[in-house]
Amino acid sequence: MKVRSSIKSLKNRHRDCQVVKRRGRVYVINKTDPRFKARAG
């Protein structure tokens, strides 16, 4: 999982990326290709 301060560029890496808020943190999840998981902050 990548950790970045900006999530905007990470959600554009793959067309199936979804931005999800969990426990006050912003995550990018991808069910078809889990390599693109990321977290903000």
Swiss-Prot record:
Q: Does the keyword Ribosomal protein apply?
A: yes
Is Oxidoreductase one of the keywords UniProt gives this record? no
- GO cellular component terms, semicolon-separated: ribonucleoprotein complex; ribosome
InterPro entries linked: Ribosomal_bL36, Ribosomal_bL36_sp, Ribosomal_L36_bact
Q: Which SUPFAM superfamilies match?
A: Ribosomal protein L36
Domain of life, per UniProt, equals Bacteria
What are the GO BP annotations of this UniProt entry? translation
HAMAP family with a match to the protein in the record: Ribosomal_bL36 (MF_00251)
Q: Which family does it belong to?
A: Belongs to the bacterial ribosomal protein bL36 family.
Name recorded for this polypeptide: Large ribosomal subunit protein bL36
